A protein has these predicted regions:
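Structured catalytic/nucleic-acid-binding cores of DNA maintenance enzymes
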Residues: 1-305
Length: 305
């Protein structure tokens, strides 16, 4: 699953390519799973909107939209299936007519969660449409913004008036003391606490393992046994790992690519994640794997206590 660095990389790439562009038309595929908002609401909100900003919030990509309230209320929707370009097969989907009353807010947000295998790509119109494409937004510039997701765990939704808010604290902004206070009284393993998105948003399996290694803490260690000084070290490790990963474009392990379809390189810097049985890069002790709360965790039994 794309984590904070991957989502941040995609958001930054999109911001460079699509901010200021306008969405002329939207095509939706036939699969309902990716749609967290009604299809008609997504189409009526996106079409005609100008993209004013793209940013990350936790593991979500938030695309800020602007349009006049008059335009929002007056635009008449056609059937979603007719949005396919000439030459692309049209998809019929029962009950997914776009005839519902469109949103009249002048500000809205298009929220994308990539799930396990989701990709949000900027493409030229002549780029071949991949099999698992669920949304195509045709832009005024001539480019297209496509959402592709083979496993369909990703989600697309819209929110009015900037109402969307992700739970949890932002790991790149939080200071050491509030970070410590989030976790110190919890009896759960520190790895499980780091993955709790209601506490700290955006950190997933990869970056929790890498951060705990740099902080010298075993993933199964109870948060209540960790000292304030150790939490300060963990805070610094989390921020350093995330920033390094963003610089290298994230970790491409399975399906992840950025907005231009390019892979990241931070997987080449992993010190423990995915390295079970391989020698620790610090002490040469074989890296171990443990299952904690149903998630694989990788650690060095000598460097981490």
């Amino acid at each position: 699953m794309p984590e904070l660095p991957e989502v941040e990389t995609i958001a930054r790439g999109l911001a460079k390519r699509v901010v200021g562009d306008r969405i002329e038309s939207v095509w939706l595929g036939s699969k309902p799973e990716p749609l967290k908002s009604p299809a008609s609401r997504i189409v009526s909100t996106l079409e005609g909107s100008r993209i004013s900003d793209v940013r990350r919030m936790g593991k979500h990509i938030v695309i800020e939209l602007e349009r006049s309230a008059e335009e929002s209320g007056s635009r008449v929707r056609r059937s979603i299936g007719t949005r396919a370009r000439a030459g692309r097969s049209k998809t019929k989907s029962a009950g997914r007519s776009a005839g519902a009353t469109p949103a009249t807010s002048a500000r809205a947000q298009w929220i994308v969660h990539l799930g396990m295998t989701g990709q949000l790509l900027v493409c030229s119109p002549d780029t071949q449409v991949e099999k698992h494409t669920h949304l195509i937004a045709k832009l005024q510039s001539g480019r297209e913004l496509r959402f592709v997701d083979p496993r369909r765990f990703g989600r697309l939704s819209v929110a009015m008036n900037g109402d969307f808010a992700a739970a949890g604290s932002e790991p790149l902004d939080i200071e050491p003391e509030p970070f410590t206070d989030l976790f110190r009284g919890r009896k759960t393993p520190i790895k499980s606490a780091l993955l709790n998105q209601t506490l700290l948003r955006g950190v997933g399996n990869i970056y929790a393992d890498e951060s705990l290694f740099r902080a010298g803490l075993r993933p199964r260690r109870r948060a209540t046994t960790i000292t304030r000084e150790q939490f300060r070290k963990l805070h610094g490790a989390v921020q350093k790992v995330l920033k390094e990963a963003i610089t290298l474009g994230g970790s491409s392990i399975s399906d992840y690519v950025d907005a231009d379809g390019e892979e990241g390189f931070f997987q080449l810097q992993h010190r423990v994640y995915g390295r079970e049985g391989e020698p620790c890069l610090v002490c040469e002790t074989p890296v171990k794997r443990a299952v904690i709360a149903g998630r694989s965790s990788h650690y060095c039994p000598k460097c981490q206590k």
